[in-house]
């Protein structure tokens, strides 16, 4: 994980596929093996891209030999006839017995209950609880940098809030936090950071404001995440009043990933269903297109906001011109000869007021679109990208060599079998091979356990991601609300001005 660099996610250079052919292996005991009877894992959907030696989504799952414990240490006794392939079909062979059907129904209910509980932990549409403002004074001797006032609006758990619940942070502090989260939670939806600068734009006020908004989105997405929001370093970032760079030099902190010293739950293995992997495959195959389409929608909403500003500016120019025309008509149409010009000028005054009022509406509509509508559209894009990055990091980090270890174990077991009955066989060599087998089995268990933990983690992320579907509704509801509000206001203005214009004279009669 320490090989990760940059702030824009993992490079999309790997040809490894998270959905490739797998022999997802987890040594388990007989009781767990029996409970998995009839459970089929997912068949490969994207074999063209598959080249991982081992993946967490698979067509089948190999098990540990009957003489291997589920702990990290294998038993001392070695049955040469036993190998890791023996349980491939045994633990996955389906039966049609009534008890098994009832058991599978129970697993399905357990899965639904698990999913419901996980989904309750996440609400991406909840109000932001962190506000970020740029501090006007810039620091630095040669290279000036911006500081940000980071304020949490509610009390955070197990922390002592600083004065006014506010701390001062730099962009580099946010970058450090993201890197730490990526190391600790490589398969969680870690949001992207805005760029530090683009060319010479690091002093441009428009760019700085966009970066501030991006930092605010980042930290608020982190705080809405059920797992990330409870991380001790996240809470430290938000509450330690001292300079974070100095704090990092004075203390030691752990960046090991969340799977360290953790074992997969037997309950999760029981509720696993192949349909889940098929859904993930479909998501991985279309996530890029969804991001592309939604980004284009967001761009069109943004362009509409820009057009509203252009319309407002043009109408202001039109209003000034109408005022000038009213002044000039008094000279062109002498009042003593054309008393109707007074009524016409009076009508143009009404038109001018109408333009001023509709101008206010256009400006306010543009502002509401910018502050209320666009952030919702862009927030959804950020979460989609975060999910995509989970898939990309999986390609980079979720590989293992379980299949190679299994072949190595089989080879050594055969060596032990061949050494039987040979008087010239070395006892020391025999013991060395036995020790190697134990070590390989231990590593195989650890890697298989990690593969299942990754599967559970990504299922949690994909499950909470399902709550983001309601963000689509929220986006268009806010968009329609703004459109409807100002369309009604402008319609009223047009009706009023039309009534006045109809009273303007069309002839001398």
Curated annotation (Swiss-Prot):
Record keywords, A-Z: Cytoplasm, Membrane, Protein transport, Transport
CDD domains linked to this entry: BAR_SNX8 (cd07597), PX_SNX8_Mvp1p_like (cd06866)
PX domain ranges (all copies): 126-245
Gene Ontology CC annotations of this record: cytosol; endosome; membrane; nucleus
Topological category with respect to the lipid bilayer: Peripheral membrane protein
Molecular-function annotations in GO: identical protein binding; phosphatidylinositol-3-phosphate binding
Main location, first listed in the record: cytoplasm
Location relative to the cell: Cytoplasm; Membrane
Biological processes per GO annotation: plasma membrane tubulation; protein targeting to vacuole; retrograde transport, endosome to Golgi
Alphabetized Gene3D superfamilies for the sequence: Arfaptin homology (AH) domain/BAR domain, Phox-like domain
InterPro entries linked to this entry: AH/BAR_dom_sf (IPR027267), PX_dom (IPR001683), PX_dom_sf (IPR036871), SNX8/Mvp1 (IPR028662), SNX8/Mvp1_PX (IPR035704), Snx8_BAR_dom (IPR045734)
Residues involved in a 1,2-diacyl-sn-glycero-3-phospho-(1D-myo-inositol-3-phosphate) binding: 170, 172, 196, 211
Name of a matching Pfam family: PX
Location of the region described as Disordered in the Swiss-Prot/TrEMBL record: 1-28
Polar residues: bias regions: 1-25
PANTHER family, per the entry: SORTING NEXIN MVP1
Domain notes: The PX domain binds phosphatidylinositol 3-phosphate which is necessary for peripheral membrane localization.
Family: Belongs to the sorting nexin family.
Function recorded in the entry: Required for vacuolar protein sorting.
Protein name from the UniProt record: Sorting nexin MVP1
Taxonomic source organism: Candida glabrata (strain ATCC 2001 / BCRC 20586 / JCM 3761 / NBRC 0622 / NRRL Y-65 / CBS 138) (Yeast)
């Amino acid at each position: 994980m320490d090989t990760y660099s940059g702030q824009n996610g993992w490079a999309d250079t790997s040809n490894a596929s998270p959905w490739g052919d797998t022999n997802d292996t987890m040594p388990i005991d007989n009781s767990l093996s029996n409970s998995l009877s009839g459970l089929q894992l997912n068949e490969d959907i994207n074999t063209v891209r598959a080249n991982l030696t081992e993946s967490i989504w698979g067509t089948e799952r190999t098990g540990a030999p009957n003489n291997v414990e589920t702990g990290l240490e294998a038993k001392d006794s070695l049955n040469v006839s036993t190998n890791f392939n023996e349980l491939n079909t045994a633990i996955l062979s389906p039966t049609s017995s009534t008890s098994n059907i009832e058991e599978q129904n129970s697993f399905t209910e357990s899965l639904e209950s698990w999913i419901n509980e996980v989904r309750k932990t996440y609400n991406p549409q909840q109000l932001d609880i962190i506000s970020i403002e740029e501090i006007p004074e810039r620091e630095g001797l040669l290279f000036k940098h911006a500081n940000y006032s980071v304020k949490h609006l509610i009390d955070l758990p197990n922390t002592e809030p600083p004065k006014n619940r506010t701390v001062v942070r730099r962009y580099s502090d946010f970058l450090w936090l993201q890197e730490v989260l990526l190391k600790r939670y490589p398969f969680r939806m870690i949001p992207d950071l805005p760029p530090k600068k683009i060319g010479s734009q690091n002093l441009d006020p428009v760019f700085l404001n966009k970066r501030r908004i991006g930092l605010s989105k980042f930290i608020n997405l982190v705080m809405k995440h059920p797992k990330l929001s409870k991380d001790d370093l996240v809470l430290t970032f938000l509450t330690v009043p001292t300079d974070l760079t100095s704090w990092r030099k004075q203390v030691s902190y752990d960046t090991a990933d969340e799977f360290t010293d953790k074992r997969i739950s037997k309950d999760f293995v029981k509720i696993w269903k192949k349909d889940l992997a098929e859904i993930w495959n479909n998501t991985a195959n279309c996530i890029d297109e969804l991001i592309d389409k939604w980004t284009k929608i967001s761009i069109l909403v943004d362009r509409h906001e820009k057009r509203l500003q252009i319309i407002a500016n043009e109408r202001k120019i039109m209003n000034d011109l109408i005022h000038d025309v009213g002044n000039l008509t008094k000279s062109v149409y002498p009042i003593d000869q054309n008393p109707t010009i007074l009524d016409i000028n009076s009508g143009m005054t009404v038109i001018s007021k109408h333009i001023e009022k509709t101008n206010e509406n256009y400006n306010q509509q543009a502002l509401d679109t910018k502050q209320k509508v666009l952030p919702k559209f862009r927030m959804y894009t950020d979460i989609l990208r975060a999910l995509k990055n989970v898939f990309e990091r999986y390609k980079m980090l979720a590989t293992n060599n379980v299949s190679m270890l299994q072949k190595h174990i089989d080879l050594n077991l055969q060596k032990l079998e061949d050494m039987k009955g040979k008087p010239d066989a070395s006892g020391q060599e025999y013991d060395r091979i036995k020790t190697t087998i134990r070590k390989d089995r231990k590593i195989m268990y650890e890697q298989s356990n990690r593969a299942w933990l990754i599967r559970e983690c990504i299922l949690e992320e994909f499950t909470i991601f399902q709550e983001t579907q309601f963000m689509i509704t929220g986006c268009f509801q806010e968009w329609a609300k703004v459109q409807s509000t100002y369309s009604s206001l402008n319609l009223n203005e047009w009706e009023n001005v039309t009534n006045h214009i109809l009273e303007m004279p069309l002839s001398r009669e």
